[in-house]
C-alpha cells in the first residue's frame, strides 16, 4: 500500500490505523522531504519514497493507494498503481481542485478502481466504529503538538512549515 502525502495528519492516521490491525502489511509513504523518513518509519511506514514536483521517484507499483495530494499528483498515481489496483483520492494537499482533460477510460484502462471519501459522509455509528477500532487495536492518536488559543498563529505557522508532521490541537483553555 502507498500513501501519497504520508506526513500529513491523514497520512499519519492511516499508518497508525492500518498498522494497528495489520502490522505486517507493507506500507510505503511519500514525502517531499526525506529528512522526515525516520519519523515516518517510527510510526509504521516501511518505505519512504521521495516525491518531487508531483512525481514519485520510483517506478514501483502498488495495489492500493491513498491519494492525499490530490488532482495535482493523481495522474502520476494512476501510473504507479498496479493493474486492478484501488486508488482512494480524499484530499487536496497539492492545492489543485480538479484534473484537466480527465479521460477515465484511457487513464483507468488497466482496470483501476478510483474511489473517494468525503468528511460529510460521517454518521454517529461510523464515528463510534472508529472510536471502537482505536480502542481495540490500541492506536496512538496523540497529536504532534498542542497549542493554546492565544498561540494559534504559531500553530498555523508550524503546520505551514517544512518541519510539521501530522496534526496539532489548539485548545481554548489556559492549561495544556
Residue ranges and their predicted role:
Residues 18, 40, 65, 77, ...:
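Terminal peptide-recognition signature
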Residues 57-65:
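A short acidic, Gly/Pro-enriched loop at the edge of an enzyme's catalytic core
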Amino acid at each position: 500500500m502507498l500513501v501519497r502525502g504520508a506526513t500529513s495528519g491523514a497520512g499519519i492516521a492511516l499508518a497508525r490505523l492500518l498498522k494497528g490491525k495489520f502490522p505486517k502489511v507493507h506500507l510505503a509513504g511519500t514525502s517531499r522531504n526525506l529528512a522526515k523518513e525516520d519519523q515516518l518509519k517510527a510510526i509504521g511506514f516501511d518505505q519512504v519514497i521521495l516525491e518531487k514536483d508531483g512525481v514519485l521517484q520510483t517506478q514501483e507499483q502498488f495495489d492500493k493507494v491513498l491519494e492525499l495530494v490530490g488532482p495535482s499528483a493523481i495522474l502520476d498515481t494512476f501510473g504507479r498503481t498496479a493493474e486492478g489496483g484501488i486508488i482512494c483520492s480524499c484530499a487536496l494537499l497539492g492545492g489543485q481542485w480538479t484534473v484537466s482533460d480527465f479521460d477515465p477510460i484511457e487513464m483507468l484502462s488497466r482496470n483501476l478502481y478510483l474511489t473517494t471519501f468525503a468528511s460529510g459522509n460521517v454518521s454517529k455509528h461510523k464515528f463510534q466504529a472508529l472510536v471502537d477500532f482505536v480502542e481495540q487495536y490500541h492506536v496512538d492518536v496523540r497529536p504532534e503538538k498542542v497549542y493554546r488559543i492565544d498561540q494559534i498563529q504559531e500553530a498555523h505557522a508550524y503546520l505551514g512549515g517544512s518541519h510539521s508532521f501530522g496534526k496539532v490541537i489548539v485548545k481554548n483553555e489556559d492549561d495544556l
